[in-house]
Amino acid sequence: MIISWYGFNYFKLKNTSHSLIFNPYGLDKVSKFSKAKADLILFSDPNQIAKAKLNKDAFIVDSPGEYEVNDIFVYGREIKNNIIYYVVFEGIKIAFLGEFGHDDLANGDLELIEGADILILPVGGGDLTTSKEASKIIQQVEPRVVIPSCHKAGSGKLKADNIADFVKEFGVKPEEEEKYKIKKKDLPQEDVKLIILKTQK
């Protein structure tokens, strides 16, 4: 599986057969994205669908529930107008927190994503999760890989904290990647890995 980041909260996951996209939109009213092409497109905020350019054949998920598309399993739960997702793709468990704010994860929410292999979560503060809050969530979920989103490097004109603030708070040496390629058998078994992705054009 290859994970790519296109800025803010826009991620694409793909293998040789299928693909999945999270949140193909920006919130700064300036960022422009090309048409999102994937088998499955997930939205944390259904109100943003109108802003996104989507291929007509994609299966769109914009509400909580359970879904299965091309052997990709999706579980969505709404928390204060934001849908968090738990996805199983190629046997890898991915927790995606979308535009999660300053709330604590309730027990039921934590049960959904606890033990995920990969955790993608905002770290840039503002209306979204701060570095300190993100670090607490990571301790609760205990993922093997952490991928930060919504930090200054990919947020366009939005005000957001630098990724360096999160790195300092989290205390794990990061690995910077253009794209993150991972197979289930290669997931780290002991120490958590922090992956900082560069934005794709």
List each language-model region with its residue ranges.
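Active-site-proximal loop/helix segments of hydrolase catalytic cores
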Residues: 80-141
